[in-house]
């Protein structure tokens, strides 16, 4: 029999009162005896701390705190330790005789919270001779020792051979080791399990009936049926997963259209934009290249036009210069003609005016003589009138002064002043400073005499003047003629100059007669010279146009060469036209062919895409239509083979499912009828009794019982007999065995065990030999093992079946795809590649365009050469007739010579024409120039002087006369004398005034008459002089004009000038015509250059913009391509058939897809934002980001449990293959997974029945326990009424509630909860969910009610409550319950632990003084019967007769507190003896 493990000792190190104390524990009861504060509770606290080192649970309260709601602040542990390292260790020995030391290292943590640090550890392999205190202490001397810290302890143990030290970081690991080694009874997997264990220890420690345990006895006593719960959970999980998968399939089916729509629209949206950008990039590149070609061509054209413009501008400049010269010559010729005509008219006017001047000269001389006589008479009259006027004025002045003096007395002074003024004036005029009033009369006579003398002298000079006048006029006339011809000169030189002029006139007339012959000769030579110059100009222009200088002798040969070149170029131009037409015809044919190929290309590309998809799907390459049809036949054969294999795998999988279902029956029954028969017979299936058999023992028991392993064990066979009569619903062989199901063993057979077999002696004459089965199915462990292997096989079969089904579906879809391909694309798919042909044709088209361009250039050059040759021939036709003129080199010299002679002759003719008349007039009177009448001028001056002297003498006489007349004013004496004296004077003055006025009147009349006559004479003279001067001036002007004209007017001059003008006009017209042509050509050339310049600028701008756009687009395109390649979507986006659509079509396609996508992603915020960002036309990469995001979104939505791919497009293809198959398979799987409500009820009932039997067995162990009035203790287990009704409905009336269990919306747990609510509407479920309630209803423990009952005195069986029992009875009852719990835990954990391990049993009891001796004896008896260790604490008055007793006494020695311990063995049979080594000397830690 397996020995039970025991606790050997408890060691306390550095606890309060215990420095190093080891308590040896008795195999039954260990008693700690001592007074208050002796250390009993501390010792038990150390044991509990080493057993359960969980600070969240540990709480050591004193007995006085039993009614307190909260304990001490440190929960009782901190105060039980000393400073420094502390240990609590348990020394145990298990059923395998292995010594295991487990314990904890404790250490106080500084701080107000009074915390304790705990480190659990375990020591294995420690020799029995080593004491625990030796491990953790180090002796320093006889009186001192040191506690080793944990790391030193570890090092010390590692140095010992065979000793293992383990330190644990978690309490779970610590308890797991203790459970595996048999130290604790139950595996404590969680904090809840630890809490239950601690509550059990706490309940035993403080005694009594623990309400915490009695309220939850089900949790303590009834094991959790994890297998059933796990089965239900697995079933529900499988059903939930199945239904979720089915729902996912339905969602996927609904999403499939969304997937298709989203993928197709996203592909259309992004691919259209992608291909549009690709097309635009290609178009932009083509445009950039075209712009560059056009730019190069335009630059060449502009350079050619610029060269042409320079040539024409140079020629135009030459023509402009020539035109200026010709205009100047023409203007000069016109001016010369005008001058000749003007000179002729001037000459006629001069002759006419000269005749008029001669006539006027004669009349003017006559009138001069008349006027001279009239002037003399007029002067005499003027002098006489002036004298009379002066006399009258003087007399009036004198008379006026006199009247004033008479009127006013004051006028005397005025008169006196006037007299003085007259005297002064007379002094000044007469130059007589000594003149006085008295001497004025004398001087008056003198000056009157001078006046008379001057008058006589003037008259004599006047007579001399008239006589010399005639001789002087002839000399002056001759002299003026000489001055007019020769210019100013001295009078004495006039004679010599006049003779020289007359001789020169004769020579000039001889030269003037030669003007006309010279002019005619000059005109002829000038005409030839102009023709020569024109020929030279034509030759120079021809050489310039030809770009080469030619000699005169080479021109005829050149003329013939140019004519031959014209003929050959004409043939070349005609041939080039035909060649150009042929090239253009070929180009049109190529263009037509390219258009047809471009129309066929999308169809071919679609067929190729379909073919590539088929090739990718089947992994084959097709080169002809025959390959396609042959592969289609292979597909049909492959489909048939796959269907056959799929059906075989499906049949095997169904067989495995059936076997799994059969093995999964509760109780190990493979036939449901056996469960019903066992329930009917009141028995238990043999497989249920052996349900806990281990996997190693399963083959043995399976062979032992053989066919009877499915037997029913019944208590009494006789009671079954009546049920066998008429029994039909049963297996063919039904085995019944009589025995007690609670204590059944294999003693019913006589067995001999052989090698892997047994011989069963059923009877004396019947043996059965059974070999151990290779796959045992007896016992739950064997069945679970088999089920596990079957599940693995089923997974393989399911995967194979799914693979085959997928292959069949894939093959069928591939067959359909091939059929569609044959019907749609087979006719065109294997034709030649239109794109390759398009590329070849495009290259040929480029060659043709290049050939046409070269041909046009060559043809243009030929045309230019042809035109140049024609122009050269035309120019030579004008030059060749003038070759003789070009050869005449002396023509210009002869023209210059004749021109010089003509200039001399014309100069002579102009001299004769200008001075011929003057010379003719001078010739008759030239002799008068020999003597110059100079005295005429002197006489003329003397006459003027005498006139002046006569006027001065007259004024002097008049002044003296006035003085003499005012002589009376100088001597006024008084007023009377002045009045009387002046009265006579007044009368005289008046008389004289009257005489003077009469004389003045006569003089005035004579002067007036003679003045009128003189005026008439002067008018006639002035008119004649004016006419003469005018005509003379006009004649001089005409002569000067004629001289200024500088031409000699003769009869032929006008005709020669007109001919010259007409010739120059013709040349000027020709030059202007050519200039106009050049200007027009130059204007056209400039316009063409401007157009080319604008075109060039536009092309440069367009080219650079396009190039910049290409470069910018290239960067963006590179980013797009990188993003496309990184995300692997190029195959989806690069749809070549879209390359043949226009940009508008692609944009329209993208816009339509965008509108559809906006609706499709309206509910997805992420895709909506990405789609909105992708609408930016400047950021094409964002569309790729949207496409990637859409694909990622679809990938995330792909059900990986259904579809095994990341590609949404492939997912859609696989969806259509998988959905129907999965739907069918999952529906059948759900039908198989669903467990019936009757099965659930049977499982729960069987479990309840088994646990009731187990509790009944536990009650048998407590029948003999009694405490005081308590005679017996038992556990009563009943099924709750509400739950019993639920089980009845599940097993008998489940058809009425199939609406719950057949609903796909409810799990089985939820359906069970709904049924429970339906059956018990009065029960409030609170806030719990149906799933939670259903899971509770699947736990059989919730169906049971457990309570502790005691048989007390005459009251019989009563419910155990603290109020109805005494303290001792309550402690005994509680201890009984705890023992039952421990035993229940051991039974529950027997399957989890090795068969050779029987765990330690130990409980506590503090304050055992409350029990009487009989109760304590009962505890001893219970411990002995149950092999349980007990530690109790009691005062000193308790001395048990059995076990080991320690007496504890707390002492103080030298300020050091310690506990003195004395140990005693049981002393009832013999004298007590002191245990060795129990007396502890005082010590203190160093």
Curated annotation (Swiss-Prot):
Molecular function (Gene Ontology), one example: DNA binding
Calcium found in the keyword field: no
**Any one cellular-component term (Gene Ontology):** cytoplasm
Q: Where is this region: Flexible hinge?
A: 666-783
Q: Name one GO biological process term.
A: chromosome condensation
Residue positions annotated to bind ATP are 34-41
Q: Which NCBIfam families match?
A: PRK04863.1 (NF003422)
Record's subunit section: Homodimerization via its hinge domain. Binds to DNA via its C-terminal region. Interacts, and probably forms a ternary complex, with MukE and MukF via its C-terminal region. The complex formation is stimulated by calcium or magnesium. Interacts with tubulin-related protein FtsZ.
Question: What is this protein called in UniProt?
Answer: Chromosome partition protein MukB
Its source organism is: Shigella boydii serotype 18 (strain CDC 3083-94 / BS512)
Gene designation per UniProt: mukB
């Amino acid at each position: 029999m397996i020995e039970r493990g025991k606790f050997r000792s408890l060691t306390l190190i550095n606890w309060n009162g215990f420095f190093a104390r080891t308590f040896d524990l008795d195999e039954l009861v260990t008693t700690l005896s001592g007074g208050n504060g002796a250390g009993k509770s501390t010792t038990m606290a150390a044991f509990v701390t080493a057993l359960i080192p969980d600070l969240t649970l540990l709480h050591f309260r004193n007995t006085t705190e039993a009614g307190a709601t909260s304990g001490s602040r440190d929960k009782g542990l901190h105060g039980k330790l000393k400073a420094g390292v502390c240990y609590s260790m348990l020394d145990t020995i298990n059923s395998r005789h292995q010594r295991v030391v487990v314990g904890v290292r404790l250490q106080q943590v500084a701080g107000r919270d009074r915390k304790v640090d705990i480190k659990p550890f375990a020591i294995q392999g420690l020799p029995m001779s080593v004491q625990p205190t030796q491990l953790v202490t180090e002796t320093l001397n006889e009186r001192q020792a040191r506690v080793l810290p944990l790391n030193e302890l570890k090092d010390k143990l590692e140095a010992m051979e065979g000793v293992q030290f383990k330190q644990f970081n978690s309490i779970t690991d610590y308890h797991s080791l203790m459970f595996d080694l048999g130290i604790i009874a139950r595996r404590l997997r969680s904090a809840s399990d630890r809490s239950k264990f601690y509550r059990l220890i706490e309940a035993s420690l403080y005694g009594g009936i623990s309400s915490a345990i009695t309220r939850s006895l089900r949790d303590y006593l009834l094991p959790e049926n994890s297998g059933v719960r796990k089965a239900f959970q697995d079933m529900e999980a499988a059903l939930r997963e199945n239904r979720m998968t089915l729902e996912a399939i339905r969602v996927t089916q609904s999403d499939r259209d969304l997937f298709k729509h989203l993928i197709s629209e996203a592909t259309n949206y992004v691919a259209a934009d992608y291909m549009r950008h690709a097309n635009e990039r290609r178009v932009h590149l083509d445009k950039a290249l075209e712009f560059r070609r056009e730019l190069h061509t335009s630059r060449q054209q502009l350079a050619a036009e610029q060269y042409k413009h320079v040539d024409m501008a140079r020629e135009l400049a030459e023509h402009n210069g020539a035109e200026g010269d010709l205009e100047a010559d023409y203007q000069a010729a016109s001016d010369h003609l005008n001058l000749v005509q003007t000179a002729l008219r001037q000459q006629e006017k001069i002759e006419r005016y000269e005749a008029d001047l001669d006539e006027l000269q004669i009349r003017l001389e006559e009138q001069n003589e008349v006027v001279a006589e009239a002037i003399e008479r007029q002067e005499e009259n003027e002098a006489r009138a002036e004298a009379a006027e002066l006399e009258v004025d003087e007399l009036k002045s004198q008379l006026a002064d006199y009247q004033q003096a008479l009127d006013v007395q004051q006028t005397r002074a005025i008169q006196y002043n006037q007299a003085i003024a007259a005297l002064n004036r007379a002094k000044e005029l007469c130059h007589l400073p000594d003149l006085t009033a008295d001497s004025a009369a004398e001087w008056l006579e003198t000056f009157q005499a001078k006046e008379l003398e001057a008058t006589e002298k003037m008259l004599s000079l006047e007579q001399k003047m008239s006589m010399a006048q005639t001789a002087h006029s002839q000399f002056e006339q001759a002299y003026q003629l000489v001055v007019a011809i020769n210019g100013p000169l001295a009078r004495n030189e006039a004679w010599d100059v006049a003779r020289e002029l007359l001789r020169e006139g004769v020579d000039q007339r001889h030269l003037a007669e030669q003007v006309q012959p010279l002019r005619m000769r000059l005109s002829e030579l000038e005409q030839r010279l102009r023709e020569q110059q024109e020929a030279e100009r034509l030759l120079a222009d021809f050489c310039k146009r030809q770009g080469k200088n030619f000699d005169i002798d080479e021109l005829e040969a050149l003329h013939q060469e140019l004519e031959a070149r014209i003929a050959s170029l004409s043939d070349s131009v005609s041939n080039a036209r035909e060649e150009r037409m042929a090239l253009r015809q070929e180009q049109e044919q190529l263009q037509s062919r390219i258009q047809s190929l471009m129309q066929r290309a999308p169809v071919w590309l679609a067929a190729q895409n379909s073919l590539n998809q088929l090739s990718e799907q089947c992994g084959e390459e097709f080169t002809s239509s025959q390959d396609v049809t042959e592969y289609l036949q292979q597909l049909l054969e492959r489909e048939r083979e796959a269907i056959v294999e799929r059906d075989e795998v499906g049949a095997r999988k169904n067989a495995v499912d059936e076997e799994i279902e059969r093995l999964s029956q509760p109780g190990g029954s493979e036939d449901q009828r056996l469960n019903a028969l066992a329930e009917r017979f009141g028995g238990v299936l043999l497989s249920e009794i052996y349900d806990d058999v281990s996997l190693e023992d399963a083959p043995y028991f399976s062979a032992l019982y053989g066919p009877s392993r499915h037997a029913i064990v019944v208590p009494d066979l006789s009671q079954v007999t009546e049920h066998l009569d008429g029994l039909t619903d049963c297996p063919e062989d039904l085995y019944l065995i009589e025995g007690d199901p609670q204590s059944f063993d294999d003693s019913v057979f006589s067995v001999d065990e052989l090698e892997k077999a047994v011989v069963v002696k059923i009877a004396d004459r019947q043996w059965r030999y059974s070999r151990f089965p290779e796959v045992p199915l007896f016992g739950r462990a064997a069945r679970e093992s088999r089920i596990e292997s079957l599940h693995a096989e089923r997974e393989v079969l399911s995967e194979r079946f799914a693979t085959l089904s997928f292959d069949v579906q894939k093959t069928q879809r591939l067959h359909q795809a091939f059929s569609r391909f044959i019907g749609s694309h087979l006719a065109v798919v294997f034709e030649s590649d239109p794109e390759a042909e398009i590329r070849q044709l495009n290259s040929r088209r480029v060659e043709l365009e290049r050939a046409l361009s070269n041909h046009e250039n060559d043809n243009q050059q030929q045309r230019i050469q042809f035109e140049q040759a024609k122009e050269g021939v035309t120019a030579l036709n004008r030059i060749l007739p003038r070759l003789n003129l070009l050869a005449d080199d002396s023509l210009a010299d002869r023209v210059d010579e004749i021109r010089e002679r003509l200039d001399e002759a014309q100069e002579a003719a102009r001299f004769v024409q200008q001075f011929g008349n003057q010379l003719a007039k001078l010739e008759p009177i030239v002799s008068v120039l020999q003597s110059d009448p100079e005295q005429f001028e002197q006489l003329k001056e003397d006459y003027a002087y005498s006139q002046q002297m006569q006027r001065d003498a007259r004024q002097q006489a008049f002044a003296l006369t006035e003085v003499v007349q005012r002589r009376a004013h100088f001597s006024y004496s008084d007023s009377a004398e002045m009045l009387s004296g002046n009265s006579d004077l007044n009368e005289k003055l008046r008389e004289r005034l009257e005489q003077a006025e009469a004389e003045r009147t006569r003089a005035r009349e004579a002067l007036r008459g003679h003045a009128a006559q003189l005026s008439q004479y002067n008018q006639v003279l002035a008119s004649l002089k004016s006419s003469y001067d005018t005509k003379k001036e006009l004649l001089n002007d005409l002569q000067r004009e004629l001289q200024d004209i500088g031409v000699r007017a003769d009869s032929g001059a006008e005709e020669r000038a007109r001919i010259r003008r007409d010739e120059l006009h013709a040349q000027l017209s020709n030059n202007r015509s050519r200039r106009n042509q050049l200007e027009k050509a130059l204007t056209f050339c400039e316009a063409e250059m401007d157009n080319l310049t604008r075109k060039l600028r536009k092309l440069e701008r367009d080219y650079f913009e396009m190039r910049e756009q290409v470069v910018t687009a290239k960067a963006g395109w590179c980013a797009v391509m990188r993003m496309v390649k990184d995300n692997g979507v190029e195959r989806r986006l690069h749809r070549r058939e879209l390359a043949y659509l226009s940009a508008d079509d692609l944009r329209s396609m993208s816009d339509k897809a965008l509108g559809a996508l906006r609706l499709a992603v309206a509910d997805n915020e992420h895709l909506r934002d990405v789609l909105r960002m992708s609408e930016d036309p400047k950021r094409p990469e964002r569309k790729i980001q949207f496409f990637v995001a859409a694909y990622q979104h679809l990938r995330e939505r792909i059900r990986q449990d259904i579809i095994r791919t990341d590609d949404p497009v492939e997912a859609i293809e696989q969806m259509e293959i998988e959905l129907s198959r999965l739907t069918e398979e999952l529906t059948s799987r759900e039908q198989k997974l669903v467990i019936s409500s009757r099965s659930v009820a049977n499982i729960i009932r069987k479990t309840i029945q088994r646990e009731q039997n187990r509790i009944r067995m536990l009650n048998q162990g407590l029948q003999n326990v009694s405490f005081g009035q308590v005679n017996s203790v038992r556990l009563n287990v009943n099924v709750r009424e509400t739950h019993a009704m639920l089980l009845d409905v599940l097993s008998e009336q489940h058809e009425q509630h199939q609406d719950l269990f057949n609903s796909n919306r409810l799990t089985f747990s939820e359906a069970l909860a709904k049924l429970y609510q339906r059956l018990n509407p009065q029960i409030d479920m609170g806030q719990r969910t149906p799933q939670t309630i259903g899971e509770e209803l699947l736990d059989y423990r919730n169906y049971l009610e457990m309570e502790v009952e005691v048989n007390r005195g005459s009251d019989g069986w009563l419910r155990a409550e603290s109020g109805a029992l005494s303290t001792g009875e309550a402690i005994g009852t509680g201890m009984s319950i705890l023992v039952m719990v421990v035993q229940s835990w051991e039974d529950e954990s027997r399957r989890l632990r090795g068969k050779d391990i029987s765990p330690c049993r130990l409980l506590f009891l503090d304050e055992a003084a409350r029990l009487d001796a009989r109760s304590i004896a009962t505890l001893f008896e219970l411990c002995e019967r149950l092999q349980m260790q007990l530690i109790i604490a009691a005062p000193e008055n308790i001395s048990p007769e059995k076990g080991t007793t320690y007496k504890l006494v707390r002492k103080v020695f030298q300020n050091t507190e310690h506990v003195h311990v004395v140990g005693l063995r049981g002393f009832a049979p013999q004298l007590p003896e002191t245990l060795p080594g129990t007396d502890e000397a005082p010590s203190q830690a160093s």
